[in-house]
Amino acid sequence: MEGLKIKYGVVMNGKKVLRIMRKYNLMAEYIRKSKKKNKNERIEDNVKPNLLNRNFTTDVPNKVWDTDVTYLIFKGSRAYLSTIIDLYDRKVISYKISKHNDNKLVMDTLNEAISKRKDVSGLILHSDQGFQYTSYEYKAICESNGITISMARKGTPIDDSPIESWHSLLKKETLYNNNITSLENYIILVEEWIKFYNTTRIKGKKVNKKR
């Protein structure tokens, strides 16, 4: 009973205090500790419907974007790649790489994409239901720029297949059959490949015509 000792200079064990409280029908005040909210927890109220329904084609640029975060892993070391592509031609609009999978990674990617494309009002931005995409920060950025949020159904990667396939292609062509010696070396290779993809590998609007 540390409180009694500090406040009144009285030393008394817990059992004696309990007997006295029972005798006089006293109740101890119990302060419930508030449960800490996981900062990486999905906010259910911010989950949006799937507006694409697996229709991943569009006839004009800057109408539908697809985004996701993926792992870059090399010998136990890990980084995270956040990417936004335009579904018109599958071109990478913006990307960011970080050692931390947090809201900042996604917001930096989104803000850069908006800065590059300027007028994005009326755009649909599609993603999965990851915690960054259901965050209030993500919602606020989209709403303030006239962007409509669309989300794949929970646990359904095929609903977000363009960006999933793009990340798979990137890993296939960078991680395998290359003399990578460190995660930092891998990240450099990823950045070089993205530049190559956007300038050389991409086939423009033919991508959409094939689908």
Segments and roles (model prediction):
Residues K139, E143-I147, L169-R211:
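C-terminal domain-tail junction helix/linker
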Residues N40-E41, S127-Q129, S135-Y136, I149-K171, ...:
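RNase H-like two-metal-ion nuclease catalytic core shared by retroviral integrases
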Residues D89-Y95, S150-A152, Y176-N177:
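Short small-residue beta-strand/loop micro-motif enriched in glycine and branched aliphatics
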Residues I6-G9, F56-T58, F74-K75, Q129, ...:
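Conserved, non-catalytic sequence blocks in retroelement Pol enzymes and Pol-derived host proteins
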Residues K96-K118:
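Active-site beta-loop-alpha junctions of metal-dependent nucleic acid enzymes
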Residues M1, V17, M21, L52, ...:
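Mobile genetic element proteins and their domesticated derivatives, centered on retroelements
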Residues M1-V60, T156, R211:
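Basic, flexible linker segments flanking DNA-binding modules
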Residues T58-I93, K99:
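An active-site-proximal beta-strand-loop segment
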